[in-house]
Amino acid sequence: MLYGLRGWIGKLLPRGPFFCNLCGYNGSIWLWRGHDNQAIRKYQIIGAGRRKCDCFACGSSDRDRLVFEFLRKEIPNFSVLRFLHVAPERQLNKKLISLGANMVNIDARKSGYKFAYGSETITADLTCLPFESETFDWVIANHVLEHIVDEKKALYEINRVLKPHGKAILMIPYSPNLSVNIEGEINWNKRQRNALLGQQDHVRLYGKAFLNLWSETFEIVRLAEVNASRDLNLFNGEKIILVEK
């Protein structure tokens, strides 16, 4: 209801420099997202920090728009593909469904929930997925792995449920200034995690080493550039983190 009203209001606002590829908004008002702290500034964490990037009309984030821009250029026909969407971003999920993608949504919450557009979400643990091997063409899990202690098991499960040559987008906040990951201690409190990892519910801060570490599980791990034809108000320097089975 709220974003529906904002979408209507957005059509009346003056045109702005940025465009939302998920809802078509091209207005002058964008909303704040994220938080700022010493760790984010110190490590220049990509995908974190306080910024004015959320679409006024639909609420999509800069990351949502980045991922969709990549997918729409990568995939000619969504209707023939099956996606697993982990902790699904509402507007991205809604857009993919509108293009005919066969979406399966999961979240680790204790009880399932429905999005406003009626898509059922299954309660599931990424380290123990309730799906047969080689089930999905694509997996999308954005800003999920930094919350999971047993990262290797989660990566194994993602690889297991992907079809041969299947792909996954696994966006994470990471520091280009760190050569290795910083792993949080189990006894760290929220304040320590916020100060040392950038967010109070993260279990690690990724450094550039993740590219090599993930190569132990996936055939291909790479950072993919996204060249948008219009200015989508994206996070400066953020690229798609793409893996392939």
Say what each PLM segment does:
Residues 7-18, 22-25, 152-159, 163, ...:
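S-adenosyl-L-methionine-dependent methyltransferase catalytic module, highlighting the catalytic core
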Residues 1-128, 228-244:
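Conserved N-terminal segment of class I S-adenosyl-L-methionine
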Residues 126-139:
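A short acidic, Gly/Pro-enriched loop at the edge of an enzyme's catalytic core
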Residues 93, 149, 178:
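Glycine/Thr-rich phosphate-binding loops of Rossmann-like dinucleotide-binding domains
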Residues 86, 139-140:
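Hydrophobic beta-strand segment of the Class I
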Residues 143-147:
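Short catalytic micro-motifs in class I SAM-dependent methyltransferases
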Residues 130-132, 149, 207:
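GHKL-family ATP-binding catalytic core of two-component histidine kinases
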Residues 81, 133-135, 166:
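Surface-exposed loop/turn positions
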